[in-house]
């Protein structure tokens, strides 16, 4: 019988050793099952499942609705607030003319009473102060009489109907106006919790140049663009899921047209 020939091994060949891992029999593998009623779920962000207080839900729904629904131009203009730098300049100027606090008022009245007792007039002790005017009815009358030199309107007044007519009134009367963020910020200016509107009627001679420069900047953003802003509706911004659905439909329609 012919002898069986063995093929010589390849040179420099390395013999592969089967890797055998020794398992400890004391440790049993327990794969996790994250189905309902099975293993404890891993920690993840569950904030979207939280039942928030009603006021939080309402403000979230209001925000979403203002993005989704079509918003008329008269209301949509309140989303175009004054830029940060110009707003800082405006508040810096108005802070110089803050109304007096209750302690300052008490001190002034005491001085006036002492002056009157001495036979002088109250004007001799305390001349007429130059302060920021606030209060919706008061500011509206100042605008109608063209006494206001600058009007700041809050963008988050609720209900918005209280101030929705003010930009049109300011435009008609030629009074410079600006829409700023935060009724609370305007409220701080006049020592109140909130304020819908604040106005300057006069300033000291040292601040005339600063006021005129500020007014020219504000007019460029509001009064000069008033007619343009009247034509632009707001809202109509859909969420990511709705946009994905629309894109998917458009893609399917395009594919159907190309195959036809």
From Swiss-Prot:
UniProt GO molecular function: RNA binding
InterPro entries associated with the record: eL8/uL1-like, Ribosomal_eL30-like_sf, Ribosomal_eL8-like_CS, Ribosomal_eL8/eL30/eS12/Gad45, Ribosomal_eL8/Nhp2, Ribosomal_eL8_euk
Superkingdom of source: Eukaryota
Segments of this protein annotated with the region Disordered: 1-34
One GO term (biological process): maturation of LSU-rRNA
Record has Transport as a keyword: no
Record localization: Cytoplasm
Annotated Gene Ontology cellular component terms: cytosolic large ribosomal subunit
Alphabetical keyword list: Cytoplasm, Ribonucleoprotein, Ribosomal protein
Gene3D superfamilies: 3.30.1330.30
Keyword Ribonucleoprotein found: yes
Family: Belongs to the eukaryotic ribosomal protein eL8 family.
Subunit-structure text: Component of the large ribosomal subunit. Mature ribosomes consist of a small (40S) and a large (60S) subunit. The 40S subunit contains about 32 different proteins and 1 molecule of RNA (18S). The 60S subunit contains 45 different proteins and 3 molecules of RNA (25S, 5.8S and 5S).
Function: Component of the ribosome, a large ribonucleoprotein complex responsible for the synthesis of proteins in the cell. The small ribosomal subunit (SSU) binds messenger RNAs (mRNAs) and translates the encoded message by selecting cognate aminoacyl-transfer RNA (tRNA) molecules. The large subunit (LSU) contains the ribosomal catalytic site termed the peptidyl transferase center (PTC), which catalyzes the formation of peptide bonds, thereby polymerizing the amino acids delivered by tRNAs into a polypeptide chain.
Name of protein: Large ribosomal subunit protein eL8A
The species this protein was found in: Candida albicans (strain SC5314 / ATCC MYA-2876) (Yeast)
């Amino acid at each position: 019988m012919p002898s069986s020939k063995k093929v010589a091994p390849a040179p420099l060949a390395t013999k592969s050793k089967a890797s055998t891992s020794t398992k400890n029999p004391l440790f049993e593998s327990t794969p996790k099952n994250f189905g309902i009623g099975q293993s404890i779920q891993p920690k993840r962000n569950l904030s979207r499942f939280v039942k928030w207080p009603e006021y939080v839900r309402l403000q979230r729904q209001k925000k979403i609705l203002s993005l989704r629904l079509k918003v008329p131009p008269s209301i949509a203009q309140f989303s175009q607030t004054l830029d940060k730098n110009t707003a800082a300049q405006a508040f810096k100027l108005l802070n110089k003319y803050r109304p007096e606090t209750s302690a300052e008022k008490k001190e002034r009245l005491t001085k006036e009473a002492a002056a009157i007792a001495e036979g002088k007039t109250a004007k001799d002790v305390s001349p007429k102060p130059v302060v920021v005017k606030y209060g919706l009815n008061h500011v509206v009358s100042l605008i109608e009489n063209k006494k206001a030199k600058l009007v700041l309107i809050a963008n988050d007044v609720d209900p918005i109907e209280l101030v929705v007519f003010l930009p049109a009134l300011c435009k008609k009367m030629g009074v410079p106006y600006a829409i700023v963020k935060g009724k609370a910020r305007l409220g701080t200016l006049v020592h109140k919790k909130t304020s819908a509107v604040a106005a300057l009627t006069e300033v000291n001679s040292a601040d005339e140049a600063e006021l005129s420069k500020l007014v020219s900047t504000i007019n460029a953003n509001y009064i000069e663009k008033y007619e343009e802003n009247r034509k632009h509706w707001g809202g109509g911004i859909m969420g990511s899921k709705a946009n994905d659905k629309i894109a998917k439909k458009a893609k399917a329609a395009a594919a159907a047209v190309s195959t036809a």
